Amino acid sequence: MTEAMNITLSTQPADARWGDKATYSINNDGITLHLNGNDDLGLIQRAARKIDGLGIKQVALTGEGWDIERCWAFWAGYKGPKGVRTVMWPDLDDAQRQELDNRLTIIDWVRDTINAPAEELGPEQLAQRAVDLLCSVACDHVTYRITKGEDLREQNYMGLHTVGRGSERSPVLLALDYNPTGDKDAPVYACLVGKGITFDSGGYSIKQSAFMDSMKSDMGGAATVTGALAFAITRGLNKRVKLFLCCADNLISGNAFKLGDIIRYRNGKNVEVMNTDAEGRLVLADGLIDASAQHPQLIIDMATLTGAAKTALGNDYHALFSFDDTLAGRLLSSAAQENEPFWRLPLAEFHRNQLPSNFAELNNTGSAAYPAGASTAAGFLSHFVENYREGWLHIDCSATYRKAPVEQWAAGATGLGVRTIANLLTA
C-alpha cells in the first residue's frame, strides 16, 4: 500500500529557492502549505487542487493548525470527479469531527449527484435519491409523495407536465414533508423548491453542443436544496420544512411542447411559451404554487435558471434575488458565516411586467427590449408566489457546476450553497 503524503501547515514563507510567491513547498517529510493570513482557506483549497494534479491520491493532514474549516477547504479542492482519494484527517474534537463527517456525507452526495450522467439519473431516480438521502438522516420524521406522468396533468401540474412530456422518462414531482414535531397540524416553517431538469436539450429552441454538454447538471438546484435540508437536520433543525422537487427531462420528440403553446396554471396564470429553453421557470412555477399554499414563513427556490446570471457572476457566485431586504440580508449573513459566495442582483416591481405576451398574461422569456434576463426570470417566478414581497428568496445557482477545472475546483459540481441554506434554516 502506498504511504500517505503528509500535508502540514506553516505561517512561515517558503524557502527562497521556491520563489517569493510559493504557496507550498516539498521536502522529505511531505508537503508544507505556507499560509500568509490573506485568504488562507482559498490558499489551502488551491494547493489541494495542485496536489491532486500531481497524482497524489493519499494524504495525511498532520501537524498543528488543522481546524474543520481548513480541513474542509482542503477537501473542496482535493475532491474530483474521477478516481478515489483518501485523506487521513487530523484529530478534531467530537463536535468538529461530526460536522466534518456530515459535510463529507451530504455535500459529497450533492456533488456526486450533480455529476451523474443523465442516462443514469432521470427524473424519478433523482426524486428517489433525494428521498433516500433524507431517510438516511431522519426517516422517522419524513413522509413523501411522488406524482408522475399523466397523474401530473390530471392534478393540474401543467408546467411540469408540459416540459417533461417530450421524454420517454416521465416528469416527476416530489413533495416531501420533514416534520420533527410529531404534530400533523404543525405549521410549516419553510418550503424549499428545486429545479430538477435531469437533462436540458433546450427542446425545440435547441442548444448548441457547446451549451448542451453540461446539461446533466441542470438539476443542480434540486440536489442543492435536498442537501441543504439534510444538512440542516444534522445541525438540529427542529421546525417543519417541506421540499418540492420539480423533475423532468427537456427533450425533443413528437410529443414535446412547442413555441406558441399556452400553459394554464392552477393559480389562474396563463403563460405563452416563446422559448422552450426557458423551461426551468415553467416547472418551478408548479412547485412555488404548492409552496405558497403551505403559508410558510420562508420560501426558497433554487435553480440553474439563466445564462444571464452566469454572464454577471461567472461560476464564482450564486445570484440572490428578493423583494425582502431583511431576509436577503439574513441569507447573505449566513453565506458569510459559511464561507460561501452569494451576490445579490436587482429585482424590482417593474421586472414583473417585462414579460409581455400577445396571447397570454405572461411570456416565458423577455424580449430584446428587456435584456435583464436573470431579473426578469425572477420576476416571472414572483407571479407564482402568493406573498412575493415577503419571505421569498430566489437563488439562480450559477456556482453549482464548472465545465472546466480552475485553480480551486476540479471540473464538475461544487456543492456550494448547501451550508448557507442550512445555516438560514437553523438560525
UniProtKB/Swiss-Prot annotation:
Role summary: Probably plays an important role in intracellular peptide degradation.
Active-site residue numbers: 207, 281
Predominant location: cytoplasm
Keywords (A to Z) from UniProt: Aminopeptidase, Cytoplasm, Hydrolase, Manganese, Metal-binding, Protease
Organism: Salmonella arizonae (strain ATCC BAA-731 / CDC346-86 / RSK2980)
Subunit record text: Homohexamer.
Name of the molecule in the record: Peptidase B
One of the protein's GO biological processes: proteolysis
Residues where Mn(2+) 1 binds: 200, 277, 279
Annotated cofactor note: Binds 2 manganese ions per subunit.
UniProt key word Nucleotide-binding: no
InterPro entries on file: Leucine_aapep/pepB, M17_PepB-like_N, Pept_M17_PepB, Peptidase_M17_C
Superkingdom of the organism of origin: Bacteria
Name of the coding gene: pepB
Alphabetical list of Pfam families matching this protein: DUF3663, Peptidase_M17
Top enzyme class: hydrolase
EC code: 3.4.11.23
Cofactor field: Mn(2+)
Alphabetical list of CDD domains matching this protein: Peptidase_M17
Cellular location(s): Cytoplasm
Catalysis performed (reactions): Release of an N-terminal amino acid, Xaa, from a peptide or arylamide. Xaa is preferably Glu or Asp but may be other amino acids, including Leu, Met, His, Cys and Gln
A GO-annotated cellular component: cytoplasm
